[in-house]
């Protein structure tokens, strides 16, 4: 089916929900470790407490992808999942800062991450469903744009409340600035998704009669689950060559990102602010500045998102992604040479450029290599190459750090940030071997 060209406003409407999704992710990334600590978790417990994200991504995304490929009702194909995920995500976000125990917070995080994945997974397929191949670059870049805005707002909101004079804590010791931010985040998440659901329509399956006949076949729950698993296995077995090549790019890219997310704040405290222990007042100052740095790279992300789309049209998606990953690599490696907090902000420019490309170019490249009837399932399987390295890192990096650097080496976080830069450089080199079948550029 020849799809009509959509206006920039229409593409913005269909991507606006990502602002809410990233608002939820941003609040989680910036605050969950601290929430666990306030509730009494030990530092050594935190990596395992973070397993909710990758495990739910590993399980939920391919299942939702396969289910959404088979769905068609009055809301469409993907939008029912946007809405269901948003409702449960908003509930979890609203309750999270009122947690009274580590177990309660951990349980809510599992609900939150599963629900966010329900909303997020169909968004990638939504772009491929709605847009002609010539517009997919701008479609995925528009998602990056709203991701950048959502993350920037989420990172800044607790600081806004603090400077507005909000102080105090809940009965569990969680700052009111965090509590208010999560509750606002719950509202933003739901409203952003509702905007996309209400302003964007979907195209029915090309052969609706055949689609309805297949869906009408009686299936028990066991057969349904079995068929979904069989479809996931089939998708992995029949994975297009481009997807296999991108898998290695994603593996090294996300190892680099996880090194940054887990260790950048600590590296800022010890290396730039000169803290000698977590009890040192400079440690907290460094952690706060690390949050500001993350806000900066989020701002850079939405500022450069559309520039990357234009450059991809002028050159190629592979060229843009390679250069962007190298920018991120240089940004992380350069932290070693920086001891001034303001110069540290410059490193985030490179990271922001890389992040804008990471959120768009691999998906634009992938969408051109996928059969239209299986885009949802393949987008879910593609998520494996993000969550598997995260699971491996959560389970092994603590032991690796102790083996290489010991427990008391405050340079270890800096070295792990630099390792993230090396991983990103490896990812950039691997882009050269990717075959972009949907790009007219070389």
Task: Enumerate the language-model features and the residues they cover.
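Hydrophobic core of transmembrane alpha-helices in multi-pass small-molecule transporters
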Residues: 92-96, 100-119, 343-357
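Helix-loop boundary and gating motifs at the non-cytosolic
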Residues: 2-54, 244-249, 253-278
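Intracellular juxtamembrane helix-capping segments at the cytosolic ends
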Residues: 118-131, 357-371
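Helix-to-loop junctions at the C-terminal end of transmembrane segments
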Residues: 59-75, 303-316, 401
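Intracellular loop-helix junctions on the cytosolic face of multi-pass helical membrane proteins
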Residues: 1-9, 100-107, 118-119, 123, ...
